[in-house]
Amino acid sequence: AFRNDLMVRGGGPSENRFFLDGVEIPNINHFSTQGASGGPVGIINPDFIREVNFYSAAFPASKGNTLSSVLDFKLQDGNKEKFSLRGVLGASDIGVSANGPLGKKTTFQVSVRRSYLQFLFDMIGLPFLPTFTDAQFKIKHSFNPKNELTVLGLGAIDDMKLNTGMEDMSEKNQYILSYLPVVKQKTYTLGAVYKHYAGKNLYSVIISRSQTNNKNIKYKDNDESKEENLSLNYRSDEIENKFRTENTFRLPFIQLNVGGNIEYAQYTNDTYQKQFTSIPRTIVYQTDLGIWKWGIY
């Protein structure tokens, strides 16, 4: 409930791909479920978006390996003429954004946002206290009318604590507190896009690095005073490094796209879990997996 999971043509929420000015980002939501793309709050600042292209089929060749859909976000450029600053106070968060010129050939835009949901949830007596923070920036430099470089970044920090000191310790709240873990999530994407315009043709090079870190910790009866009460300590890290080149040739009556990509992904997992069943057991699991991927089109 209260999530914006995207499911297209019967596919799952983990089968979608997201691009921000050509840079792939692993997730666009706060408090996402690992392996899926949904969450209750979006990370991308909507004030920065110029347009969104949604593909549910016939995916572009440059965005292959897609099962369900592609969301391709195009961002605005910073103002070339003057500097502007904007503050936003919402029902659950506060934010500030700025954009403007950095010299004659460079523009920027940046935004930072932080929630105060933990105070609202505590006031209405909910057993969990979520907090999220995100930041986004874009810098664009035009060397000349034919060459430009864009550097962008997107990051988020999610933290969900347990409200063990709440006054309304009803049976329902006690049950939720008994199984809900403390959750910490961090994610970021950094990317650079170089474009060269040659008449009607376009040559692009995209490099990026993204990382998603998840931590779940749970103590029996939420008592952290004894080490033996630790029932769950889950840590995972997903790192992806990507290089892609796209070349668009506009010929009479046809447009030809040619390119290739190479990626290296590293996935690590460290899990410790106690299961309190009729026959108690402890699960200890560790893995470190590296994967190379490449493609041409």
Label each residue range with its predicted role.
Residues 15, 47, 80-82, 93, ...:
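Strand-connecting loop/turn motifs
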Residues 140-158, 180-297:
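Face-selective signature of the C-terminal outer-membrane beta-barrel domain
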Residues 40-84, 95-97, 104:
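A beta-strand signature from Gram-negative outer-membrane beta-barrel systems
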Residues 1-27, 50-51:
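Extracytoplasmic beta-strand/coil segments of soluble accessory domains associated
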Residues 24-54, 137:
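Short acidic/polar hinge/loop motifs at secondary-structure boundaries
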Residues 80-81, 101-185:
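Periplasmic-side early beta-strands and strand-to-turn transitions of outer-membrane beta-barrels
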Residues 19, 51, 70, 84-88, ...:
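Residue-level detector of the transmembrane beta-barrel scaffold of outer-membrane proteins
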Residues 33-38, 54-55, 79-81, 119-123, ...:
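Extracytoplasmic loops and strand-loop junctions of Gram-negative outer membrane beta-barrel proteins
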